[in-house]
Amino acid sequence: TKLVVNDVSFQVRSGEIVCIAGIDGNGQTELVHAITGLGETAGGRILINGRDVTKKSIRARNTHGLSHIPEDRHKHGLVLDYNLAYNLVLQQYFEPGFQHWGFLKNEEIYKYADKLIEDFDIRSGEGADTITRSMSGGNQQKAIVAREISRDHDILLAVQPTRGLDVGAIEYIHRELVKQRDAGTAILLISLELDEVMNLSDRILVMFEGT
């Protein structure tokens, strides 16, 4: 069996943006899947705040401090046929503030969603009731960014966070990433955009053929 990612070791510290750059197809996607729990690992360890999460579920990694802006917002970031409110609590709906004995607290969910929509200027036709599929790509991405950086987290994994977006949305997301870094978040950025890499990164790592 060929190892797609082999002998990769690095740390991301609080208050810095570390970028993994390189040509697409050199193991970046598999590395992301290993970190987030979307894929299994053949060996090695993944630590968040010193805690080994290598065998933990996706939810456990999220509750241990990992936020994730995925590369494919439709496949891994949103449930397109849910409304915006429910998408904004996808990572938190099970918390006591949003449910009681398994029953969702819709009033609290909508109150939280309305705040994020205002704070992050997410534009949608019907506010929190908007079906997410009907929103522009830029506003879908804003919704993911809002959700992931508004909940408790220590590390933010941002994978191609501006792919396919217009200039205004790109600048907005870059500002939010810098704000997060300045607030002490550890950010791991995976990007193929050279300008993005050079403008945002405190440190740059390059992957080639899985290493």
Describe each model-derived feature in a short phrase.
Residues 1-211:
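Glycine-rich phosphate-binding loops of nucleotide-dependent enzymes
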